Swiss-Prot record:
EC number(s) stated in the UniProt entry for this protein: 7.1.2.2
Membrane association type: Peripheral membrane protein
Subcellular location: Cell inner membrane
Native source organism of the sequence: Brucella abortus (strain 2308)
Lineage of the species this protein comes from: Bacteria, Pseudomonadati, Pseudomonadota, Alphaproteobacteria, Hyphomicrobiales
Keywords: ATP synthesis, ATP-binding, Cell inner membrane, Cell membrane, CF(1), Hydrogen ion transport, Ion transport, Membrane, Nucleotide-binding, Translocase, Transport
The family this protein is said to belong to: Belongs to the ATPase alpha/beta chains family.
Molecular function GO terms recorded: ADP binding; ATP binding; proton-transporting ATP synthase activity, rotational mechanism
Full protein name: ATP synthase subunit alpha
Catalyzed reactions: ATP + H2O + 4 H(+)(in) = ADP + phosphate + 5 H(+)(out)
Annotated site residue numbers, Required for activity: 370
UniProt keyword annotation of rRNA-binding present: no
Gene Ontology annotations for the cellular component aspect, listed alphabetically: plasma membrane; proton-transporting ATP synthase complex
SUPFAM superfamilies: C-terminal domain of alpha and beta subunits of F1 ATP synthase, N-terminal domain of alpha and beta subunits of F1 ATP synthase, P-loop containing nucleoside triphosphate hydrolases
Amino acid sequence: MDIRAAEISAILKEQIKNFGKEAEVSEVGQVLSVGDGIARVYGLDNVQAGEMVEFPGGIRGMALNLESDNVGVVIFGADRDIKEGDVVKRTGAIVDVPVGPELLGRVVDALGNPIDGKGPIKAKERRRVDVKAPGIIPRKSVHEPMSTGLKAIDALIPVGRGQRELVIGDRQTGKTAIILDTFLNQKPIHDNGPDKDKLYCVYVAVGQKRSTVAQFVKVLEERGALEYSIVVAATASDPAPMQYLAPFAGCAMGEYFRDNGQHALIGYDDLSKQAVAYRQMSLLLRRPPGREAYPGDVFYLHSRLLERAAKLNDENGAGSLTALPVIETQGNDVSAFIPTNVISITDGQIFLETNLFYQGIRPAVNVGLSVSRVGSSAQIKAMKQVAGSIKGELAQYREMAAFAQFGSDLDAATQRLLNRGARLTELLKQPQFSPLKTEEQVAVIYAGVNGYLDKLAVNQVGKFEEGLLASLRTEHKDVLEGIRNEKALTDDLKAKLKAAIDAFAKSFV
């Protein structure tokens, strides 16, 4: 066999040229113990708090407890495949998620991985899940309405863009329905409104049944609202760290729109379950428990999340992120630990009551206990003009109704007040999936406060409202358009609206 020197030297030169001398350095540790979704790891001396670490098999975790001799890591996934002695690698990255318009129309988990079977998400940007909220200087006070499409809320407890409005109530009182209707109400603006008014929606489901989340997504899809929505799901079967992380992940996705001069709305459904997941993690990490066994920083958990909802000023793009956190109470007890915490953080609350729900008053909003601390600055002028008196009348009605149970002979004025109150309460009822545009709400409430319903039987109010809206949509489009464009009831518009309602009231039998 011939040995060709030239050939050998050519091969050697090629090998030397392609020789890579870069050594891959990664800091690794060892699992000391694992169980209940928590791993104690030895050797990750330089790991950062909140850093993502990787276990064998691609399972991720997050370093939360940095102690002198070990690190407490919460595991995002099943801990069955992790055993003592396994090697744990640092990734060098704080937990982040993909953000951007590519996520619209998708259902993702708390780490931003798609779970809807529609293929990978090609997001161009990633953001940390836990960032500092905007300071005082970049903010502006809330002044634009965030229309929910529900008369009881838009008239009495208005929500503005950049506000945090808590939805609180027992189970099965229609809390999720309020968020769903608010999402559906954005459809007309997305279809033919200007870009600057569009509101992108993020729904975070924490600790709910998968079937419930699937139902929510199905309704959004059927009604064409999924195209401007993102759903982040950490269901009841997901590990506690995922349930803890989901609201932060959803918030980061909403902040992308806020920081790019657009508007976003995020519903956290619900934060009670996030607090329970956080309590579970904290106790397993051996952090000292406080009231109701929650850790001492559970207030900070919710405050740092909700403070990220803000209205930014014009120099910072004038974007906004509105938050609708949900809290589930037990037996209408709003003085428990988590409800009082979140009430004190938010700018108002919508209080839903089981009794009202079973009486058929839906949405079951208790108008007396619900408040919006932003108030009428989050309403258009037309709504302020008509809804100003309805609040007072309903408050008087509630007071009188309590007395009227005892006395049978009531004077005419009291009787009139009770009649009006019963009809206004009926007027504020609304079936699910039928949000109304603001101008339609203004017209209906105008009819209510100006005595058009007083002579009707209570059970005719709903029919009158339907007929009036149908008549306005077909024969008096100019009135509705006028209210939409002017955003106020001018004398001319008021006269036209009055004439339209008069004409309909005459024909209504």
